């Protein structure tokens, strides 16, 4: 694996495992952009699915490639290569399409210049959320950014953050990228740190000169965490807060300690089901893993029962597949891995049978020259009349970090009795689901995209969950004490 080290100026590549000492990143960028475009054009279902989601994909596929290729001459390092790849992928406005570095990239806690404070997105505006201790001449916390160097805060955000750092057409994209608005993150395609910015405090506006402050990794991390809720080192745990269980599920990743966590849940299930109620905290539960939905369903089945939750899962409807040899091969390879695992064969014979049926459907569609074919999804389970074992109220706490499989879990949790959704607006995902990953020619990036279309999904394309009135948290999401105190009031 290669680690590319950033610096303030154009710099060379640190080479690991015998790679060449210098690379023409401009050529690599053009090559990777074209390869990503061709892979999506030839295999992504959105290319041939009618409707708004397909139209959005097709409008960017070629136009976005041309736009990104026009910027490739500015690529001069691994960092700028990664930024341009992200720009093209984010332009599809589909959270299930991504181009990520295969090496350790910049990460969220990185800047080469910053003014000693940072902003957060709140109430449709950018406001100061964190100021370095002892910093003089900075706008006070809560000040609203009006403009910088004569450019409005919105126009600055669009030029500097949108597509480069995230999707500003979504609330979650606004929240997660807001700390970077006044930082220089070594993106040569966008402006760096502005010199003069105007902030509003109440009705009064004042211009401040932003001065570069020393870069300290701990300060940069604290500044980001002071503006955006960021899960800690232990994503899975059960605590007791205000006299009731608080179930932390801040990750749905495969490498989290699910065995230990599920053991905790099972040992405390009688308490969880008691009249006092409990909290399921899904903030930051990024769910890009193929198993993310199953992990969340596994938690629900342990707290309630499979007999109670299964009839309340959303109806799957039909799934549309694009009939291409590459997409068929993905299922062939998946089926082979399933059949080679004795435990999976023993425990999941129905999944193997279903996957084999999909491969057969690919063969039939390809032989007939069809572009697509549809398969029925999981049938809705019959309601056996099983009683609800959970006596008390349940609050499910979410934020913009709840994405992908986390949203699938909400599709089911929000259908259970006495469950309320609280917090802030979640992330979004498209109807193009189940990621496939392709290594791009440079070896420095992977393209991932959803390779089948859930055209009948009850939750619409790119539709987030938004807590109802009275259940939306409007304070600083990074103030954990305030968040927990507020959640406690929801049980009163």
Residue positions per predicted region:
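Flexible, low-complexity junctional segments that flank or bridge functional domains
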Residues: 22-321, 325-333, 393, 408, ...
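Extended C-terminal subregions enriched in glycine
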Residues: 393-415, 420-429
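N-terminal signal peptide c-region/cleavage motif recognized by signal peptidases
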Residues: 17-19
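A substrate-binding/cap region within the structured catalytic cores of diverse enzymes
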Residues: 292-376, 384
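Bacterial N-terminal signal peptides that target proteins for export
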Residues: 1-8
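Acidic-histidine catalytic/liganding microenvironments
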Residues: 2, 272, 416
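Extended, charge-rich low-complexity interaction segments
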Residues: 309, 339-354, 450-473
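Short, conserved helix/loop micro-motifs enriched in His/Cys and acidic residues
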Residues: 382-397
């Amino acid at each position: 694996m290669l680690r590319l080290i950033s610096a303030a100026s154009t710099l060379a590549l640190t080479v690991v495992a015998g790679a060449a000492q210098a690379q023409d990143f401009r050529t690599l960028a053009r090559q990777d952009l074209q390869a990503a475009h061709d892979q999506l054009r030839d295999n992504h279902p959105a290319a041939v699915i009618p409707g708004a989601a397909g139209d959005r994909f097709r409008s960017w596929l070629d136009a976005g490639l041309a736009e990104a290729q026009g910027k490739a001459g500015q690529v001069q390092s691994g960092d700028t290569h990664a930024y341009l790849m992200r720009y093209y992928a984010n332009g599809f406005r589909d959270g299930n399409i991504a181009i990520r570095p295969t090496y350790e990239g910049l990460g969220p806690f990185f800047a080469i210049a910053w003014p000693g404070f940072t902003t957060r997105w709140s109430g449709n505006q950018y406001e100061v959320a964190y100021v370095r201790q002892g910093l003089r001449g900075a706008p006070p916390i809560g000040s609203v950014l009006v403009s910088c160097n004569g450019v409005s805060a919105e126009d600055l955000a669009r030029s500097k953050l949108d597509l480069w750092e995230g999707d500003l057409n979504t609330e979650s994209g606004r929240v997660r990228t807001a700390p970077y608005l006044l930082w220089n993150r070594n993106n040569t395609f966008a402006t760096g740190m502005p010199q003069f910015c105007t902030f509003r405090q109440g009705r009064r506006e004042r211009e401040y000169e932003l001065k570069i402050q020393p870069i300290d990794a701990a300060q940069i991390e604290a500044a980001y965490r002071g503006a955006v809720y960021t899960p800690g080192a232990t994503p899975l745990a059960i605590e007791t807060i205000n006299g009731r269980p608080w179930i932390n599920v801040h990750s749905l990743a495969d490498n989290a300690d699910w065995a230990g966590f599920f053991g905790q849940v099972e040992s405390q299930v009688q308490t969880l089901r008691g009249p006092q109620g409990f909290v399921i905290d899904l903030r930051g539960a990024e769910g890009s893993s193929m198993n993310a939905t199953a992990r969340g369903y596994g938690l629900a089945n342990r707290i309630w029962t499979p007999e109670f939750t299964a009839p309340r899962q959303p109806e799957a409807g039909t799934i549309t597949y694009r009939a291409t040899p590459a997409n068929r091969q993905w299922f062939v390879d998946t089926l082979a891995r399933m059949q080679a695992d004795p435990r999976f064969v023993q425990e999941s014979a129905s999944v193997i049978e279903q996957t084999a049926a999909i491969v057969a459907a690919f063969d039939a569609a390809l032989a007939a020259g069809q572009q697509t074919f549809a398969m029925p999804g999981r049938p809705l389970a019959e309601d056996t009349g099983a009683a609800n074992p959970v006596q008390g109220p349940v609050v499910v706490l979410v934020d913009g970090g709840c994405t992908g499989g986390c949203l699938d879990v909400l599709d089911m949790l929000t259908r259970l009795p006495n469950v309320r959704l609280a917090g802030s607006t979640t992330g979004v995902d498209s109807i193009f689901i189940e990621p496939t990953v392709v290594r791009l020619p440079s070896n420095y990036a992977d393209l991932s995209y959803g390779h089948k279309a859930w055209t009948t999904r009850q939750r619409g394309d790119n539709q987030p969950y938004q807590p109802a009135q009275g259940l939306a948290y409007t304070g600083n999401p990074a103030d954990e004490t305030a968040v927990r105190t507020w959640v406690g009031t929801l049980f009163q």
